[in-house]
């Protein structure tokens, strides 16, 4: 069996896997990007459920995961209950907007949520707000263009290009008087340092990485000790500081796959396939290629 399988519409959720490996390097981990159905953020509720359910079926057969981390806010808020119902033999950990954390750091009581259209429009956000931030105003911004930019350009664009891509969203939240912005799409985590450079010092940037990883580790009986309030998760070019110099012999899943590995479900052309190879090289993980049906 594989300890953890991470799923997302693209490569945005990789920082979750890298953070878990920083905490527990001997874990067997597989990352599956459903690139054939990217982007998820513009799909209907029913479409998201259909795509994710089919994806998990393939993953279950191929990797026999103990835990699946749904490293995608859109997948989580739309399909998590369905997945738990359909695959009761697998433990699922979802990712949802870090509204509670944002409320704890906001002094103005105005919180920004940057996410996909599907996440922004999901009523679950209102439930989270009423439960954890009832005295705060929640300002949302759907930015599918930024998600697409990160998926296809994050690891080749210059820092200046990345900051230019992020700036319109932050200008919007600044004009709305927000002093905390939630990165409500896992793709944005690859740009954490870029967001901070554009936001700080007047706007705090928050995400759900440590909370999700803590939950995933606890399911398999491991503890999470916070190394710092703002750990060096992934630097600008997408290279985990831990993995940059290597971390010894790779783990192997019981199915024989090297761990950690990245699999995709489709690509547009050879150039795009090569981009995934480059990405894997920078993260220090194996590229498994296409996930077979």
Spell out what each predicted region is:
Residues 1-236, 246-293:
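Non-catalytic structural scaffold of enzyme domains
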């Amino acid at each position: 069996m594989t300890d953890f399988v991470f799923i997302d519409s693209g490569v945005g959720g990789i920082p979750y896997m890298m953070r878990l490996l920083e905490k527990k390097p001997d874990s067997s981990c597989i990352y599956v990007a459903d690139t054939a159905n990217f982007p998820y953020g513009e799909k209907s509720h029913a479409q998201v459920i259909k795509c994710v359910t089919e994806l998990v079926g393939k993953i279950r057969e191929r990797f026999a995961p103990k835990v699946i981390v749904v490293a995608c806010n859109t997948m989580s808020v739309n399909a998590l209950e369905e997945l738990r119902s359909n695959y009761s033999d697998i433990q699922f950990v979802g990712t949802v907007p870090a509204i509670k954390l944002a409320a704890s750091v906001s002094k103005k009581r105005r919180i920004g949520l940057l996410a996909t259209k599907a996440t922004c429009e999901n009523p679950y956000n209102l439930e989270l707000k009423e439960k954890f931030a009832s005295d705060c105003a929640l300002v949302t911004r759907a930015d599918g263009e930024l998600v697409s930019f990160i998926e296809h350009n994050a690891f080749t664009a210059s820092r200046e290009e990345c900051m230019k891509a992020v700036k319109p969203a932050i200008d919007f939240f600044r004009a709305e008087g927000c002093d905390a912005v939630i990165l409500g799409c896992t793709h944005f985590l690859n740009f954490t340092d870029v967001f901070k450079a554009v936001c700080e010092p007047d706007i705090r940037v928050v995400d759900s990485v440590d909370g999700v990883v803590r939950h995933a580790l606890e399911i398999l009986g491991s503890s999470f000790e916070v190394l710092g309030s703002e750990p060096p998760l992934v630097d600008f070019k997408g290279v985990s500081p831990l993995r940059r110099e290597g971390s010894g012999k790779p783990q192997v899943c019981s199915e024989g796959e090297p761990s950690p590995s990245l699999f995709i479900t489709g690509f547009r052309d050879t150039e795009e396939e090569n981009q995934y190879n480059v990405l894997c090289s920078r993260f220090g993980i194996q590229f498994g290629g296409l996930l077979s049906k």
